[in-house]
Amino acid sequence: MASTIQALPQEVVYLITAGEVIDSFAAVVRELVENSLDAGANRIVVYLWPQQWRVRVADNGCGMNLDDLQQAASAHSTSKIRSSADLWKIHSLGFRGEALHSLTTLADVEIISRAPENVGWRVVYGDSGKAVHVEATAIAPGTVVTVSNLFASCAARRQGLPTTAQQMKAVQATIQQIALCHPQTTWQVWQNDRIWFTISPAATAGQLIPQFLPQLRPSDLQEIKLEIPNPENPQLSTNNKPNASALALVVGLPDRCHRHRPDWVRVAINGRMIKLPELEQTILAAFHRTLPRDRYPLCFVHLLISPDQINWNRNPAKTEIYLHDLSYWQEQVTQAINQALRISAANIPESVQTTRVSQLLKAAEEKGNYNFNPRNANPADNTQNYLKAVAQVSNTYIVAEHPGGMWLVEQHIAHERVLYEQLCDNWRLIPVEPPIILYQLSPAQVAQLQRIGLDIDIFGEQLWAVRNLPAMLQQREDCAEAILELSWGGDLQTAQVAVACRSAIRNGTPMSLPEMQKLLDDWQRTRNPRTCPHGRPIYLSLDESSLSRFFRRHWVIGKSHGI
């Protein structure tokens, strides 16, 4: 009986491979601009003609000589790696040698390129990736790749693609993601011979994001960059470069910006945006109890780590990877986010007005020099108070002075943040005598109280006795109402938030200056001082220079006004 299993013809193999690598306009743009970045380009121009199924990418990179041009579109040809050992030393965006060859299988491809000190060449490629036409041409150093008649040989592929508008939206998202990882690059994108959008270069990703989200102000973002040891030997000094990695982080400050979906929870590794659900969940967990309900953070994490920590050989688009010691990197990301959310002069140039106040003052954003002492700081450093209590307004807001201006702090939610973090660190239940009697609890309410650790048993018909309670509620007169509130569901953290909220100083409560100062000191030492556990902003800050401009003090300095 003849065998039914046969080797596929080479052209079928290439067509299958091409379909895995190139599946859309966005994939074409992604592969071509990644080649441009690998060539050292810092200016990239993308031309799109979606109705003609044509894409062109031009760059000012290093270009190619004639020998490389003739080989560039051959199957599995690359300048990035030479052996299997090089798979663990990848510093480039591309390395498979499949993209250009796949494009020649699915479209007509032409490349014009010139290396410095050489003449330029134009090469047209056939279906197999071989050069079928070569001619000298005039071109500035760099490369121009034109892909025409995309998917002409795959009518079903064209019909299965989304609408033109959706494809162009995907192209824009792809370019923005790549630009975020390479902020020093200038981008210009044309559609149907008209300029579509541009991206100006920036020193950092944090300076680039407002170009994508115009409603954001630079002061809404906090950006830090940390050197961290590789997990093989975390005890080694980070000054030992071969054993050190870097973590660049941009976060939207939770008291100023958040989103209705997690579309800006993004992770990049070594210049490429990736999908890593474990790290994305780590980011969301780090922002827990800092944002309003059903809101999500703006957070971009870019890990620059040793190539031997990554296995890129998981997905043809290289958007999914295997990352070694994942738990270690999760811990580093959590610590970096916690550091970024603190109010520290070492890492936050504080912008001080909300949009409404900024419009009132008609002043540009200014940077203050605030700081606070984190929980794990040296106790000797805790002697300096960055905020000095001055007064209380409406028995609700604490007016605080600092070297750069003044703050208004709402006393209830500041105290709520302090108590919540204390409860998270030490959830302590104490016996209560006589027991607190509750009436007409449902089985679900009883189960909820038992789930958070309360000792509750039947005391009579429709009566239950609670024999312990959270220590913070001990001195309150409304213990029964507080416990009843805890019975309505939620996890332990929800219960801790409820206890903190009920135990915190009420708005409308007069406070002495020493009491206000102690609250400010305690609040400055919290891990997440910007918002309460419900996500509300705790403070409003006004810097001295903005106040001076509003009162026009700089107009009269030096004149005879006695000022």
UniProtKB/Swiss-Prot annotation:
InterPro entries per UniProt: DNA_mismatch_repair_CS, DNA_mismatch_repair_MutL, DNA_mismatch_S5_2-like, HATPase_C_sf, MutL/Mlh/PMS, MutL/Mlh/Pms-like, MutL_C, MutL_C_dimsub
UniProt keyword annotations, A-Z: DNA damage, DNA repair
Recorded superkingdom: Bacteria
SMART domains: DNA_mis_repair (SM01340), MutL_C (SM00853)
Listed CDD domains: HATPase_MutL-MLH-PMS-like, MutL_Trans
Molecular function terms, GO-annotated: ATP binding; ATP hydrolysis activity; ATP-dependent DNA damage sensor activity; mismatched DNA binding
GO biological process: one example: mismatch repair
Presence of the UniProt keyword rRNA-binding in the record: no
Any one annotated GO CC term: mismatch repair complex
Reported function: This protein is involved in the repair of mismatches in DNA. It is required for dam-dependent methyl-directed DNA mismatch repair. May act as a 'molecular matchmaker', a protein that promotes the formation of a stable complex between two or more DNA-binding proteins in an ATP-dependent manner without itself being part of a final effector complex.
UniProt similarity note: Belongs to the DNA mismatch repair MutL/HexB family.
Protein name as annotated: DNA mismatch repair protein MutL
Source organism (scientific name): Nostoc sp. (strain PCC 7120 / SAG 25.82 / UTEX 2576)
Name of the gene: mutL
